[in-house]
């Protein structure tokens, strides 16, 4: 019995060592935010904002729906793979987490969420700041696995924290909710969003995080949910608001670098790379720039080949679109944090 315990301990220690060494200076990818990074947390919530059913996930490695808002893998997975950490980033709320999942990173993101508490409340999902409660529990689990607070601190301080928030605040909460759009101008609301972002990053910093990759919003007016109302043309007012927020967010990222000693934050542009696919789809092998493959009134029957479509559904890019725009982001992360 004692021999079995000793052998198990040796194996666990070996797993920890391999995980830390394998990824070099970046041992883990940890994600927060919305459906761009949610790998299945909403499956375990009482919410209608979930996609744990066919045809979602049909091109995933298991050919099954996982709760990811797409036909296959999403940026969380692709970034972790590109950094040499692992191919799949599990959802923190999954009951099937293994020790190595904890060691190499998980996603706390919740599809439909945002920086504004009203955004999450409307959809019954996990508000971005409330995702920190799960992160605190994660730290305790991580510490129990490493058995060493210094190792735990090292993993957290060297992990890359990827954040995607703001898409739903603009597209859903501000544009459709008079409680917000009658009280705030779009200028004051985007200022508020940036302030919420700063507070969230500060909280993560206080919990030991030091490397932040902060994503801007997508070109919201080009999402099929908006563009299809104009016959496939991008809705410029929505894009203008996205650009406004992204400019302010990029400025705030620079402020964070001077505000938080020993940390490094980078702004990750999601807007322009996706807009390029919409404007010049054939250049990257796509045939449909704004018509989704699936799950829309105009496309009730899924397309045969999602890799030819920029968008999977009315709000989310296809796996192929992500595979096209994520490699430069991986390079940016490597150059900034490695």
Curated annotation (Swiss-Prot):
Entry keyword annotation includes DNA-binding: no
Key words of the record: Hydrolase, Lipid degradation, Lipid metabolism, Secreted, Signal
Main localization, broad class: secreted
Biological-process GO terms, alphabetical: lipid catabolic process
SUPFAM superfamilies to which the protein is assigned, alphabetical: SGNH hydrolase
Enzyme Commission no: 3.1.1.-
Leader sequence residues: 1-23
Catalytic class of the enzyme: hydrolase
TM spans (from-to): none
Cellular component GO terms, alphabetical: extracellular region
Residues annotated as catalytic: 35, 313, 316
PANTHER family in UniProt: (RAPE) HYPOTHETICAL PROTEIN, GDSL ESTERASE/LIPASE EXL3
Protein family (similarity comment): Belongs to the 'GDSL' lipolytic enzyme family.
The protein's name in its UniProt record: GDSL esterase/lipase At5g63170
């Amino acid at each position: 019995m004692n021999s079995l315990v000793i052998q198990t301990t040796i194996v666990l220690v070996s797993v920890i060592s391999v995980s830390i060494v394998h990824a070099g200076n970046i041992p883990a990818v940890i994600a927060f935010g919305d459906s761009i990074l949610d790998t299945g947390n909403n499956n375990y919530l009482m919410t209608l904002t979930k996609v744990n059913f066919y045809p979602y996930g049909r091109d995933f490695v298991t050919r099954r729906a996982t709760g990811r808002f797409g036909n296959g893998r999403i940026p969380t997975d692709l970034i972790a793979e590109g950094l040499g950490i692992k191919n799949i980033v599990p959802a923190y709320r999954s009951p099937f987490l293994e020790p190595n999942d904890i060691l190499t990173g998980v996603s706390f993101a919740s599809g439909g969420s945002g920086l504004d508490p009203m955004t999450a409340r409307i959809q019954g999902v996990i508000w971005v700041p409330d995702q920190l409660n799960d992160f605190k529990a994660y730290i305790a689990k991580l510490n129990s696995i490493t058995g060493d607070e210094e190792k735990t601190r090292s993993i957290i301080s060297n992990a890359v924290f990827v954040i995607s928030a703001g898409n739903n605040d603009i597209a859903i909460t501000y544009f459709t909710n008079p409680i917000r759009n009658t009280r705030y101008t779009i200028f004051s609301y985007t200022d508020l969003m940036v302030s919420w972002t700063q507070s969230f990053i500060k909280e993560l910093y206080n919990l030991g995080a030091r490397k932040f990759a902060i994503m801007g919003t997508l070109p919201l007016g080009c999402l099929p949910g908006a563009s299809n109302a104009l016959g496939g043309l991008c809705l410029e007012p929505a894009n203008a608001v996205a650009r406004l927020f992204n400019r302010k967010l990029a400025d705030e990222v620079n402020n964070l670098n001077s505000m938080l000693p020993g940390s490094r934050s980078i702004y990750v542009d999601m807007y322009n790379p996706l807009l390029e696919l919409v404007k010049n789809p054939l250049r990257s092998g796509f045939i449909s720039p704004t018509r989704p493959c699936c799950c829309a009134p105009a496309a009730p029957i899924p397309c045969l080949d999602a890799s030819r479509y920029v968008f999977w559904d009315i709000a989310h890019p296809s796996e192929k679109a992500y595979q096209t725009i994520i490699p430069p982001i991986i390079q940016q992360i490597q150059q900034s944090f490695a």
